[in-house]
């Protein structure tokens, strides 16, 4: 568990650290003070693109990740949306993709529990969420390491399956 005030402080520090700005996959980073979250727009990894072509027979355009805080679990919460490339009558467009087997597509079977949710404070939009139920066991919540909780959480819940390379 991470108290809300600590989460808020660490989120700002994480944003200021430029770790996402320097990430090769990251196209855009936006800190949303009103909604108390961090929005990332990512290019898909080669592996994710291959999985999508194989499993869904589609091309990806980008991935959206939204880091927010679960007041129910007192933990960080990762939300995800996948956007596919589509062409209708020769006009290119992007469309929200709702794969039937998201765990296989992301190659996170057995690592994380994902579910499809409607997020009220994000205009009622549909997102996949990485369920925060076992987060403190996965990340470790000893008091002496609390100052690095969010950074460790990001390395597990984001970089462990997407990888990290500086741009």
From Swiss-Prot:
Keyword Manganese: no
Role noted for this protein: E2-like enzyme required for the cytoplasm to vacuole transport (Cvt), autophagy and nucleophagy. Acts as an E2-like enzyme that catalyzes the conjugation of ATG12 to ATG5. ATG12 conjugation to ATG5 is required for proper localization of ATG8 to the preautophagosomal structure (PAS). Likely serves as an ATG5-recognition molecule.
A GO cellular component annotation in the UniProt record: phagophore assembly site membrane
Top-level taxon of the source organism: Eukaryota
Disulfide bonding pattern of the chain: none
Family (UniProt): Belongs to the ATG10 family.
Gene Ontology process terms (BP): autophagy of mitochondrion; cytoplasm to vacuole targeting by the Cvt pathway; macroautophagy; nucleophagy; piecemeal microautophagy of the nucleus; protein modification by small protein conjugation
GO molecular function: Atg12 transferase activity
EC number(s) per entry: 2.3.2.-
Positions annotated as active site in the UniProt record: 133 (glycyl thioester intermediate)
Protein name in UniProt: Ubiquitin-like-conjugating enzyme ATG10
A Pfam family annotated for this UniProt entry: Autophagy_act_C
Source species: Saccharomyces cerevisiae (strain ATCC 204508 / S288c) (Baker's yeast)
InterPro entries in UniProt: Atg10 (IPR016524), Atg3/Atg10 (IPR007135)
Membrane topology: Peripheral membrane protein
Effect of mutating residue 133 to S: Strong decrease of binding to ATG12. No more formation of ATG12-ATG5 conjugate. Defect in autophagy
Organism taxonomic ancestry: Eukaryota, Fungi, Dikarya, Ascomycota, Saccharomycotina
Assembly, per entry: Forms homooligomers. Interacts with ATG7 and ATG12.
Subcellular location: Preautophagosomal structure membrane
Record-linked Gene3D superfamilies: 3.30.1460.50
